[in-house]
Amino acid sequence: MLALFRASGAENRNLRRAIKSILGFRPGNIFLYRLAFRHRSASKVTHGVRRNNERLEYLGDAVLSAVIAHYLFKKYPTQDEGFLTEMRSKIVSRASLNKVGLHMGLHKMIQLEHGHGNNGGFKSVDGDALEALIGAIFLDKGFRFTQKIILKRIVGMHMDVDELERKDWNYKSKLIDWCQ
């Protein structure tokens, strides 16, 4: 039993170091961050409840969307709602978040059920973990801290917003506009 606690303590220290290295801060409630990296395929059932990162992912998605909406509102003061919505969609898209999560090295920390390989064939595992991580930061540190981390350490270091602005995204809308 004591070995279990030591292993858990070592795992917690390693996770704390990894988060400090990637995001520049020491987490408080390490168990939130451990949960953020537990994929549904590796769910643990406690008192009849499946414990995985999906609830944190839900929360992180909402926090990320709010932070990005505010960021874009300030960055583009003369742009209309359609432009802002399209830009937010580009930034928080599954493809974009997967790319950022992979670039950040989150795949190294994700706990998957054995036999699923690096990403277990799950296409959105890195982006889902990124959203869950944002949810964990929010619960651990609050909105303002999370906002700073998102803008400085995620958007600032791993996204080129100006490049995303130039990128054609909504091909269906472009086709409809062209046909009219």
State the predicted function of each range.
Residues 1-180:
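Double-stranded RNA-binding/processing signature
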